[in-house]
Amino acid sequence: MSVTDVSGLSQLGTKVDTPESPEKAVLEKVPNGNAGTDYVVRFTAPEFTSLCPMTGQPDFAHIVIDYIPGDFLVESKSLKLFLQSFRNHGAFHEDCSVYIAKRLVELLQPKWLRIGAYWYPRGGIPIDVFWQTGAAPEGVWLPDQGVAPYRGRG
């Protein structure tokens, strides 16, 4: 087992305020101690919040991010703060979902990444957004994201 070098991180182990916006949020990475081995990392944010850009009302989603790392892993505290930065950010569901994925791809250059964003209904219609970088490498176990389709009270 190896210890990861965290010397270059600016947020881990310190008190950090929630960033003002996703654009100002600092995503950080750490070396992947298992580079060269294909495996899936999953982050789940069941209480993701952003704002409707038209009404300013809150929007809620259950977000699942799966990725197969290359040389780097996302540092989880920086990811948490990045996701929290959407709380006061107005954007459509699709824009939030794809922006999250593209920021992670830009930072990590993973072998593969997908996001499933399961948005709770607004105007009676749930919106689910799915995006991925391409086909996953063969032979990697990709579990279902485990989020049932929205059924309301039915």
Curated annotation (Swiss-Prot):
Disulfide bonds: none annotated. GO terms for biological process: queuosine biosynthetic process; tRNA modification. Residues 1-30 are annotated as: Disordered. InterPro entries: GTP-CH-I_C/QueF (IPR043133), NADPH_dep_7-cyano-7-deazaG_red (IPR050084), QueF (IPR029500), QueF_type1 (IPR016856). Keywords: Cytoplasm, NADP, Oxidoreductase, Queuosine biosynthesis. Residues 17-27 have a biased composition (Basic and acidic residues). Residues 1-13 have a biased composition (Polar residues). It catalyses: 7-aminomethyl-7-carbaguanine + 2 NADP(+) = 7-cyano-7-deazaguanine + 2 NADPH + 3 H(+). It is found in: Cytoplasm. SUPFAM superfamilies: Tetrahydrobiopterin biosynthesis enzymes-like. This is NADPH-dependent 7-cyano-7-deazaguanine reductase. It comes from Agrobacterium fabrum (strain C58 / ATCC 33970).
